[in-house]
C-alpha cells in the first residue's frame, strides 16, 4: 500500500510517500520548518503544502507530538497550547481534501521499529524512547501498542525527564556525553522499574551517535539498542498507522 507519511516535529515537518509493505520511502523526504508560532492553522497549511507538492490523492498518515485520542489532540507540549482540544484529524482532512490518520509521533516511530526495525519479531515488553526536542515514548506488549504513554514527562529530581535528559537538554546545558549518559541512565532506570521492559530502543536523531553513549549505560537489566529506522521512523510509522486504520472498502 502506498501512503503519504507526514511527521510533525518541534522544528520541522517532514513528508514522503511510503511503501508500507516494505517500510521504505518512495522518494526523498521533503522538510519544511515548523511555523512559529506553531498554531493549528499554520501547521495545517504546511501539511496541505506537502500533500499538494506530492500531488497526493491517497491516504495520508500524520504524526503529532502529543497525546491523540480519536483524532483530537489532548496535549502539545512542544508546539502551541492552542492545539489542546482541537479535532486535528478533521482539520487536516479539511485542508488536504484527503483521508488522514493521526497518531502520536513516538507511537508512530515505535510502530515502524516494531514492523521493520530494531523491534521486528520481538515479543515481551518493548519500550521505544525518542530523544530530541523532548522525550517521546511508545510501549509494546507482544507487539501490541499501548498508545499515548508520554513517559518523557515522568518526574526526575523535581523536573520532567525530558527537561534533563532530552537531546535538547544536552545541547542547552552543554553536557558531555558522559554527563548526559548519566542522566539518561537514571531515567532509563526509572522506566525499568515502571515497565520492566525486555528491550529498550533508543530513537531520535541522536541514535545515529549511539556509540558515544550506549556503552556508558552499564546498570540496566534490559537490552538497549539504537533504532534502525532513524529519521525515517516517524514518516514510515505514520504511513503504517494509516494503512492499518484505513476505512474498509
Residue ranges and their predicted role:
Residues 1-60, 68-72, 92-98, 112-128, ...:
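ATP-binding/phosphotransfer module of carbohydrate and carboxylate kinases, centering on a glycine-rich
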Residues 73-85:
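A charged helix-plus-loop insertion that forms the helical arch/lid used to bind
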Residues 135:
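Extracytoplasmic strand-loop-helix segments at the start of, or within, the mature domains
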Residues 100-105:
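General beta-strand structural signal in soluble alpha/beta enzymes
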Residues 65:
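Conserved NAD(P)H cofactor-binding loop of Rossmann-fold oxidoreductase domains
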Amino acid at each position: 500500500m502506498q501512503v503519504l507519511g507526514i511527521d510533525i516535529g518541534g522544528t520541522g515537518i517532514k513528508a514522503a510517500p511510503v511503501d508500507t509493505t516494505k517500510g521504505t520511502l518512495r522518494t526523498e523526504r521533503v522538510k519544511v520548518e515548523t511555523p512559529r508560532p506553531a498554531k493549528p492553522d499554520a501547521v495545517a497549511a504546511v501539511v496541505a503544502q506537502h500533500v499538494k507538492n506530492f500531488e497526493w490523492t491517497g491516504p495520508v498518515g500524520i504524526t503529532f507530538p502529543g497525546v491523540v485520542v480519536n483524532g483530537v489532540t489532548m496535549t502539545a507540549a512542544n508546539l502551541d497550547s492552542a492545539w489542546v482540544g482541537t479535532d486535528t484529524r478533521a482539520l487536516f482532512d479539511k485542508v488536504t481534501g484527503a483521508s488522514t490518520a493521526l497518531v502520536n509521533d513516538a507511537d508512530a516511530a515505535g510502530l515502524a521499529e516494531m514492523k521493520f526495525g530494531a523491534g521486528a519479531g520481538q515479543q515481551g515488553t518493548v519500550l521505544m524512547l525518542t530523544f530530541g526536542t523532548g522525550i517521546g515514548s511508545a510501549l509494546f506488549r507482544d507487539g501490541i501498542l499501548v498508545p499515548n504513554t508520554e513517559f518523557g514527562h515522568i518526574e526526575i529530581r523535581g523536573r520532567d525527564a525530558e527537561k534533563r535528559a532530552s537531546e535538547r537538554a544536552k545541547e542547552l546545558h552543554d553536557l558531555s556525553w558522559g554527563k548526559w549518559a548519566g542522566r539518561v541512565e537514571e531515567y532509563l532506570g526509572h522506566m525499568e522499574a515502571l515497565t520492566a521492559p525486555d528491550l529498550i530502543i533508543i530513537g531520535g536523531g541522536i541514535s545515529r551517535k549511539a556509540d558515544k553513549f550506549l556503552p556508558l549505560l552499564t546498570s540496566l537489566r534490559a537490552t538497549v539498542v539504537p533504532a534502525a529506522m532513524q529519521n525515517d521512523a516517524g514518516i514510515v510509522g505514520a504511513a503504517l498507522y494509516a494503512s492499518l486504520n484505513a476505512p474498509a472498502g
